[in-house]
């Protein structure tokens, strides 16, 4: 318990506090504007899309960026949460349950169902690597989508109507962007606490060198499954949020193209960067939203082309020298470092150096032990007879 509290305390240091401030500020500002009647009709929907897109991008970044495994079936977990959560919410509301309570229970069940499915799929799939794992996860996403399409309880090809969507329109529950942004805050606390713990260091060690991680005693299978389950859980919750904001829920919205779009958010923001995933998810969601608004009629067919061109330009100029100089000049961490007193900065440095000394000491001890084992084996093993030289007289 003490270690868990220490991990939470470390996760709230100044250099990790920016995410919470930004998300909480957006949540408070737009909530006040919404209840003041200062928001137009489309903005709450856009904010909700940004919220569940951040959930999807950060959760996939756990697998792709921090664990180092390529998954192309993330939309499948979202599909499970959307269909199951919407179906259960319809039953709960029809039985007289308050819509807000129905939403909370549906999110928990939808997330847990996606997590269980992540365990079932991940147990055999995560023994593969690279392209093979990508193909398996891609196939999984398509299988789940078609199963949901053919189940009569989910409405078949016509889709599943959402009572939660009716409750949102009737203002029986708060606007969904408030729920989704609160979930983003919860997810950031969980993910940053995980990554800054010993489990997070084990996960990044597996990404850097899986063979060396096994040699040092890290349970690689356990940590791969742990990351896969957590990622699937938040994707399932994002699916419930999505299903609550649309009616009907259609299987066509969870194809492999959407999985690729989530992966683009991760890659564009930087694999292994939580801040990057948040920014990229926001930019791509806003881009998609306004392209759908402006490109209507015959021009809707070129939306994908325009979207692809903009993404290519963004990827090319992301690493441009001019933009790198701007990012370095206005780096938030450097600006905050100037504000913090000098003695506090030194204490942070001393803490980091102390932790690094412990890590390097453990590594050096492992090297010494492995060297001792090799030397001992070479001493205790019997000498092998020399091979006779060719041409020597017997």
Where are these regions (language model features)?
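Transmembrane alpha-helices and adjacent helix-loop boundaries
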Residues: 1-394
